[in-house]
Amino acid sequence: MTEYNWNERHIITFPEEILALSTKDLHVYYGEKEAIKGIDMQFKKKKITALIGPSGCGKSTFLRSLNRMNDTIDIAKVTGQILFEGIDVNAANINVYEMRKHIGMVFQRPNPFAKSIYKNITFAYERAGVKDKQFLDDIVETSLKQAALWEQVKDDLHKSAFTLSGGQQQRLCIARAIAVKPDILLMDEPASALDPIATMQLEETMSELKENYTIIIVTHNMQQAARASDYTAFFYLGDLIEYDKTNNIFQNAKLQSTSDYVSGHFG
């Protein structure tokens, strides 16, 4: 078994003006257990960043902290800063509902609402009291087009979202997330429940979406990280170990642990 120097780090940084989001000394605790250990990390605007690492390394916990999803866990405590447009979204006075309009989330398994395709997209607007039908129609069409789903469902908008295939449901969830025009889209293993064809379609959708959005994705699929992302971060036991351009991580990693992990020789 290879012995690694876990004190080694290689983490790139970016100029402030091209940052979409950053964390400073971010810790996450579940009770007494420290799941994330003081991570400083920056995300570049309109790029796809993949978070990789063994099961239990903290990558999903880290992702969920970026828009306060860990708030729903009673024993979770998050300290440090999460900076979006100069504002610490981890501060106690932040309106979490409003913040999540800027930092959206797509979950591991498709979770459409028990409503029509149309009402899945308009849900947030109708909840806010918006009744302008033309406005809502335009939002539905634009969002579904951006999620590469419009052509498949444009004649069935008032059918139940549950009539869609798994891949279509996941793209509907993406459309629902981008309908409120977020700046950042968080994706927690969005292809894990999809077949290979639906996965490829999802990756193509992500590539188109990065023209308008910053995407941060957790994946266990090394091929997906290599294909779909611009930057990749390797996590291990709650620490950020290496963070660089995806080509560098997969072809010329600075650290042996990273190189072994992405090539399947880790351990």
From Swiss-Prot:
It comes from the Bacteria. The complex is composed of two ATP-binding proteins (PstB), two transmembrane proteins (PstC and PstA) and a solute-binding protein (PstS). The keyword Cytoplasm does not apply. It is a peripheral membrane protein. Its EC number is 7.3.2.1. This is Phosphate import ATP-binding protein PstB 2. InterPro entries: AAA+_ATPase, ABC_transporter-like_ATP-bd, ABC_transporter-like_CS, P-loop_NTPase, PstB-like. ATP binds at G53, P54, S55, G56, C57, G58, K59, S60. The gene is pstB2. Belongs to the ABC transporter superfamily. Phosphate importer (TC 3.A.1.7) family. Keywords: ATP-binding, Cell membrane, Membrane, Nucleotide-binding, Phosphate transport, Translocase, Transport. PROSITE patterns: ABC_TRANSPORTER_1, ABC_TRANSPORTER_2, PSTB. Signal peptide: none annotated. The keyword Lipid biosynthesis does not apply. It is found in: Cell membrane. NCBIfam families: 3a0107s01c2. GO terms for biological process: phosphate ion transmembrane transport.
